[in-house]
């Protein structure tokens, strides 16, 4: 297990300088913490995003805005290097055993977020998804394997193979919102998406983003269209927790409608108004959009 210490008030993974510098020079892992910060910043600044915090408004949220997201990103970004460090240090153990090794880092990262935001959950889903991805990247680099979209997603799937069974199927009581939604609707949420190797991202979002950019769309237009693709296909538990299965059906059908033809920003603004009126926030899709943007910058295979 990583040795956790508290230098200058920040929890970190204790690794020898030689080991850390060895893999930080790998071409496949340059400044991964900065890459994550860029992806998270891209997501919050992208506008207009129906129901979500952006530069135009706070979406269906009363307790957060762009400034709070930026504060949160600044607080959590250094931790993603710790996930990568831990993956590299434990490259000699099977992926199935790796999740338990990085849980303390995830908990500490969440605490850093909550401390910075005064208790507001801005990035819990992002910490979970990007923490897994960074751990996988370090593990692959430590084994001398290529870091690609496929190897990253396959590694996360192997890490989380038993996550749904261990934390949802065998749960005797609904202690968390995710457990409640699984028991009531059979939705596996972020755990299921990770256990699938981010299947929604790989099957829908990445192809949509690649196709849009290949067709000449600018990054913002391509990302907005990709967000609609995610909203149309992702069984977003953030939406269900606010609006039930009817709310999810509303979001998915609305997104599908807007995907017919070129991207219409005025139609996106109207969708934003509709989701705000119904208090629906597709936060799970927002997390997956940021993840898609990060993965897009790695080779496919």
Swiss-Prot record:
It comes from the Bacteria. Its EC number is 2.4.2.52. GO terms for biological process: prosthetic group biosynthetic process. InterPro entries: CitG, TriPribosyl-deP-CoA_syn_CitG. It is an enzyme of class 2 (transferase). This is Probable 2-(5''-triphosphoribosyl)-3'-dephosphocoenzyme-A synthase. It catalyses: 3'-dephospho-CoA + ATP = 2'-(5''-triphospho-alpha-D-ribosyl)-3'-dephospho-CoA + adenine. The gene is citG. Keywords: ATP-binding, Nucleotide-binding, Transferase. Transmembrane segments: none annotated. Belongs to the CitG/MdcB family. HAMAP family: CitG. One of its GO terms (molecular function) is triphosphoribosyl-dephospho-CoA synthase activity. Coiled coil: none annotated. It comes from Pectobacterium carotovorum subsp. carotovorum (strain PC1).
């Amino acid at each position: 297990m990583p040795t956790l210490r508290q230098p200058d008030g920040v929890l970190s993974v204790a690794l020898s300088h030689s080991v850390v510098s060895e893999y930080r020079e790998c071409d496949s892992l340059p400044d991964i913490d900065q890459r994550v910060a860029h992806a998270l910043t891209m997501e919050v600044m992208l506008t207009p995003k129906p129901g979500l915090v952006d530069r135009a408004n706070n979406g269906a949220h009363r307790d957060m805005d762009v400034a709070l997201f930026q504060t949160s990103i600044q607080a959590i970004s250094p931790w993603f290097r710790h996930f990568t460090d831990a993956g590299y240090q434990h490259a000699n153990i099977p992926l199935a055993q790796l999740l338990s090794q990085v849980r303390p880092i995830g908990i500490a990262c969440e605490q850093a977020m909550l401390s910075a935001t005064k208790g507001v959950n801005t990035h819990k889903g992002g910490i979970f998804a990007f923490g897994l991805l960074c751990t996988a990247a370090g593990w692959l680099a430590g084994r001398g394997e290529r870091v690609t979209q496929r190897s990253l997603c396959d590694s996360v799937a192997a890490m989380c193979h038993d996550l749904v069974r261990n934390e949802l199927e065998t749960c005797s009581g609904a202690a968390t919102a995710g457990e409640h939604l699984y028991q009531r609707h059979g939705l596996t949420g972020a755990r299921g998406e990770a256990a699938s190797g981010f299947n929604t991202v790989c099957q829908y979002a990445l192809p949509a983003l690649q196709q849009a950019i290949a067709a000449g769309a600018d990054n913002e237009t391509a990302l907005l269209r990709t967000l609609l693709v995610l909203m149309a296909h992702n069984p977003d538990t953030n939406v269900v927790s606010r609006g039930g299965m009817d709310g999810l059906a509303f979001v998915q059908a609305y997104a599908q409608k807007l995907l017919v033809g070129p991207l219409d920003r005025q139609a996106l603004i109207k969708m934003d108004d509709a989701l705000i009126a119904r208090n629906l926030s597709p936060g799970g899709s927002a997390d997956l959009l940021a993840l898609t943007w990060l993965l897009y910058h790695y080779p496919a295979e």
